């Protein structure tokens, strides 16, 4: 059992052990304090937030006690007075969503209200933000469009009326042919088309978190299968967020429609085997954020291909707990 490419179940117990060793190696001694990667000497917000997310996925996160309390305090220490969390690697929307999402794993909230996001709650606020994103760079723009929504939802600042406004904008602006965002700005070459799919992923997980009907699930499946058949998901060199974004869109769309179900399941299984082969061959490497991308991808593929990827305990879906990655 466990030869990638054979279609037989693949045992990933050793990969889970490597991930836990990686996280431990990035620890700086105090509870919750992690560097961005093993060997780093400075506490890093993403190191701490991503370590919490990884350990949640692996069912290894302390739920109570002094370790939990110190971790929460450390995460809160990164917040600015306007409510934002900031980091040089990502914009404040992404970083805030990541930090608030990490706190939520401990059933905790940030110390300060997210006042920098309050203008988005006013009439037309979130719609203006989404309208004014640079839709020629949709993947990066989705950090803002989905990160703001995630942070507002997880902190309880966004009421039902706001949620409906947000979902309504997404439904209206979804391209009916591709199922992707944004209508009128879908790139057709392989790179730009995949960027639209990866951007759409960020908005799909907000909709899934809110248990909303999915707009154009059949078209989303067609687009995901197009990227698969066009070879955009090669796991020969690296695996991580790209394969995970794709897997989430395709897997979750199959829950809303039976359209091309057999093809979708076959593609998900093949990509799952490719990702498993990569991590078994190359091991766990990169930054804590890179490893989060690998682990979340494995979790979604384990769910999408039942019985194929075996771990000591089933991997938890981070996005079923909080709407941001």
Show the residue positions of the predicted features.
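A cross-kingdom feature marking solvent-exposed beta-strand/loop segments within repeated
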Residues: 36-39, 82-86, 178-181, 185, ...
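Active-site cradle of extracellular carbohydrate-active enzymes
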Residues: 159-212
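Terminal, non-catalytic domain-edge segments
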Residues: 1-77, 91, 96-156, 161, ...
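Short, aromatic/basic-rich helix-turn unit that serves as a nucleic-acid recognition element
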Residues: 235
């Amino acid at each position: 059992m466990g030869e990638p490419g054979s279609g037989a179940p693949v045992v990933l117990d050793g990969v889970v052990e490597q991930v836990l060793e990686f996280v431990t190696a990035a620890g700086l001694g105090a509870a919750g304090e992690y560097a961005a990667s093993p060997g780093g000497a400075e506490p890093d917000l993403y190191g701490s937030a991503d370590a919490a997310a990884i350990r949640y996925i692996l069912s290894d996160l302390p739920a109570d006690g002094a370790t939990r309390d110190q971790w929460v305090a450390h995460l809160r220490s990164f917040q600015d007075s306007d409510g934002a969390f900031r980091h040089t690697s990502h914009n404040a929307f992404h970083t805030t969503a990541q930090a608030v999402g990490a706190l939520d794993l401990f059933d905790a909230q940030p110390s300060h209200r997210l006042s920098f996001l309050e203008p988005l709650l006013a009439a037309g606020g979130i719609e203006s933000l989404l309208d004014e994103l640079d839709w020629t760079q949709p993947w990066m723009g989705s950090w803002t469009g989905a990160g703001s929504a995630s942070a507002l939802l997880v902190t309880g600042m966004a009421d039902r009326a706001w949620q409906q406004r947000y979902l309504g904008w997404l439904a209206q602006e979804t391209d009916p042919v591709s199922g992707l965002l944004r209508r009128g700005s879908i790139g057709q070459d392989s790179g730009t088309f995949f960027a639209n799919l990866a951007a759409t992923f960020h908005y799909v997980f907000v909709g899934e978190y809110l248990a909303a009907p999915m707009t154009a699930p059949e078209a989303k499946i067609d687009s995901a299968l197009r990227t698969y058949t066009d070879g955009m998901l090669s796991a020969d060199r690296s695996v991580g967020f790209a394969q995970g974004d794709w897997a989430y869109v395709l897997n979750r769309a199959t829950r809303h429609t039976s359209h091309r179900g057999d093809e979708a399941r076959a593609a998900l299984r093949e990509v799952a085997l490719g990702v498993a082969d990569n991590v078994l061959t190359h091991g766990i490497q990169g930054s804590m954020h890179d490893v989060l991308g690998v682990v979340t991808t494995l979790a979604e593929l384990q769910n999408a291909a039942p019985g194929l990827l075996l771990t000591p305990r089933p991997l938890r879906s981070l996005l079923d707990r909080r709407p941001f990655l």
